[in-house]
């Protein structure tokens, strides 16, 4: 049974300030910029692009600075508040809304050039339905870049340890974290009719770039 929606909202509301502080960590900044570049290499501006589970907005803002029309959505009101504040302070034009991404998405059919879903899949109660909704929203030739915590138990990166510690601390709440590997994430994406362009494992996470 997946963890209830209120649980994730509670957790990420409480962690919003800590996630915003991570913005200044060189490792985090480099990862955000590299992720934004990866999508920018296959999606021409202005997109549009949706960042699902956008958190404090780092990826959405990185894409907006590259000339994309970006909408970031997240189930945590405080995370969205942090993202909006950062956009205003940095004078970056991006839209952020509070929305549960496990529900049907509020984007029209074939309306998006690109979708980011960075470290959100592990919390979605129905992963196949989530990917199917993304496919519905992508226009032909649009791209999805999705990442999830890596199942590789030998990894000891800070990110991998973060997710494993979270899973251990919240063990009384089932379904808090799901781990993936290249096979399971590729299969999940392909089963919903998307074509996998690239699948790779990075420290602590697995990522798939797919085309509609």
Outline where the language-model segments fall:
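Short conserved loop adjoining the S-adenosyl-L-methionine
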Residues: 104-109
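Short catalytic micro-motifs in class I SAM-dependent methyltransferases
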Residues: 119-123
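Class I SAM-dependent methyltransferase SAM/SAH-binding core
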Residues: 50, 56-103
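Conserved class I S-adenosyl-L-methionine
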Residues: 1-44, 62, 145-167, 203
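Acceptor-substrate binding/catalytic loop of class I
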Residues: 167-183
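A conserved beta-strand element that flanks and buttresses the S-adenosyl-L-methionine
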Residues: 116
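A short glycine-rich, Lys/Arg-flanked "PGG" loop and its adjoining helix->strand segment in the class I
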Residues: 128-140
